[in-house]
């Protein structure tokens, strides 16, 4: 059982919702925001 690095379809299921969208990887919503607007920051402590 070798790791077919050149062909990721073997260990990467192509079901709807399993593939990373927009930015790719696990970078969260802040990296996938393509709208060009700044994120709304809610300050909870300090100042």
Curated annotation (Swiss-Prot):
Gene Ontology cellular component terms for the protein in this record: endospore-forming forespore
Polar residues biased stretches: 33-47
Upregulating conditions: Expressed only in the forespore compartment of sporulating cells.
InterPro entries: SASP_SspN
Any one GO biological process: asexual sporulation
HAMAP family (alphabetical): SspN
The protein's name: Small, acid-soluble spore protein N
Organism lineage string: Bacteria, Bacillati, Bacillota, Bacilli, Bacillales
